[in-house]
Amino acid sequence: MAKSPSRSPRKRVRKQVADGMAHIHASFNNTIITITDRQGNALSWATSGGSGFRGSRKSTPFAAQVAAERAGVAAQDYGVKNLEVFVKGPGPGRESAIRALNSVGYKITNITDVTPIPHNGCRPPKKRRV
């Protein structure tokens, strides 16, 4: 039985992106950070829950900071240097995620709040009685 000629394993070439966008979705229960290129194609992402935090600890600013650091380090493999930040939601991880991206070494060029505001749309949830 003849062996087929073995192919040498080709190293996957990652595209180099200088400018990127960071989308931070900060809800009351979790924080999701996605780093994309200019066209919106995802390069890396991380969540508070995926970073090892469970339950009520997912919604802390520290959990958002750890998630932002993980997403930022993963996106550095693509050569991202500058980030434009889009923040959505009222959660506690908004500011700490931006600070964490800054501490990883990105130059933040712009911060935009894209939280959706209803024009008297859906009825909000009832107030909690504790």
From Swiss-Prot:
UniProt GO BP: translation
Superkingdom to which the source organism belongs: Bacteria
Presence of the UniProt keyword ATP-binding in the record: no
GO terms assigned for molecular function: rRNA binding; structural constituent of ribosome
InterPro entries according to UniProt: Ribosomal_uS11 (IPR001971), Ribosomal_uS11_bac-type (IPR019981), Ribosomal_uS11_CS (IPR018102), Ribosomal_uS11_sf (IPR036967)
Gene3D superfamilies the UniProt entry points to: Ribosomal protein S11
Alphabetical UniProt keywords: Ribonucleoprotein, Ribosomal protein, RNA-binding, rRNA-binding
A single Gene Ontology CC term: ribosome
Pfam families: Ribosomal_S11
HAMAP family from the UniProt entry: Ribosomal_uS11 (MF_01310)
Function: Located on the platform of the 30S subunit, it bridges several disparate RNA helices of the 16S rRNA. Forms part of the Shine-Dalgarno cleft in the 70S ribosome.
Family, as annotated: Belongs to the universal ribosomal protein uS11 family.
Subunit and partners: Part of the 30S ribosomal subunit. Interacts with proteins S7 and S18. Binds to IF-3.
Official protein name in the record: Small ribosomal subunit protein uS11
Species per Swiss-Prot/TrEMBL record: Shewanella woodyi (strain ATCC 51908 / MS32)
Gene this chain is encoded by: rpsK
